[in-house]
C-alpha cells in the first residue's frame, strides 16, 4: 500500500459520494442556498479557516508537526485570498471529525480525505465563476485549486513515510473514510 493507492481506492470506493460532493447541489449546500460570488468566496474561506484551526489545534509532538504548520499557514492565506474579510461562522462537520484524530496515520488519512473532498468543492467553485462570467475569480480559484493539489501530493508523500504497517494504513484509511462520510452527511443534511 502507498498513499497514491489509498487515494485511488478511496475515490473508487466512494464514487457516489464524490460525484455528489462535486455537483452544483453541493455548492448550493455549501453556500446555504446563496448562489452568488460573495457567498461562494465566504464558503471557501470558512472551509479554509476551519481547516487551519484543526491543524493549529494538533499538538506539535508528532513527526508531522511541520506539515500541519505549513498547511495551516497556507489555509489562512487561502482564506484571505478568496474573501476580503474571512470569518468562521459555522464549521463544516468534517472538521469536527478531523480534529478528533490523535495519531499520525489517522491524522494523515483524515487530511487525505479532506483534500479529496475539497478538490471536488474547488472544481465546482471554478465552474461557478466560469458560469458567472467572472474570469478573474475563475483564474484565482484555478490557481488555488493547483495549490490544493500540491498540498494533497505532500500529504500523500508524508503518508508513505509515516505508515509502515498494515495497521497504520488501516488507521489512515478509516480516518479518510470518516472525513469523507462526514462531508457527505453534511451535504445530505443541508
Predicted regions located by residue number:
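Non-heme di-metal
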Residues: 2-190
